[in-house]
Amino acid sequence: MKNLVENELWNTRHQFFETMRTDSSANVREAIGYIPWYFNLPDTTQKYEIAWKEIMDEKGFSAPYGLTTAERRHPEFRTRGVGKCEWDGAIWPFASAQTLTAMANFMNNYPQTVLSDSVYFRQMELYVESQYHRGRPYIGEYLDEVTGYWLKGDQERSRYYNHSTFNDLIITGLIGLRPRLDNTIEVNPLIPADKWDWFCLDNVLYHGHNLTILWDKNGDRYHCGKGLRIFVDG
């Protein structure tokens, strides 16, 4: 599988993993091209890391309300209308969640030089901020990348689209509790030093234990000392 993905799906000209037609590459960068990192599949070489630069490019996937499902520079971007399950560029939280999981894997498990925690944090901010509709918390099918308007927001099929792994992104990505097979507790928050003075992730069941992860910049929020602290069963 690894060899097939790297040899058949990598578009050398676009420097991106792309989907295939029956006889050729689709020749378009799509968010699904980050899925290989969801499984930590690509080699840990610099050859593939260039694909992540598209996350920060406004002609790539970067939009005012988050990450688009197709590159914005493509001539067919958002050309297929609205309301027909089109995946030609609008923001789908399902796809954004996959990309953010892949991004966290890439930042934690690869010796990369492309992304900083500021990039991940900003995309998480946009992901969270977009999940409102008419002033109330909401997650739906897909939204406009420029206005943030939920494209099927008032229809029943959209408002039950809670399939975006929101909790997992907070726990394993933002707070940074990295799942492992052994009994090591690995925590690597992807939060810039100047953003949050404190956070607490409490009552996390992990390998048969109850974890609490605290960040208290000055030590005056939780009164458990300054900095990052991890408590196991207590």
Language model regions located:
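An alpha-helical repeat/solenoid feature that recognizes helix-turn-helix modules
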Residues: 27-42
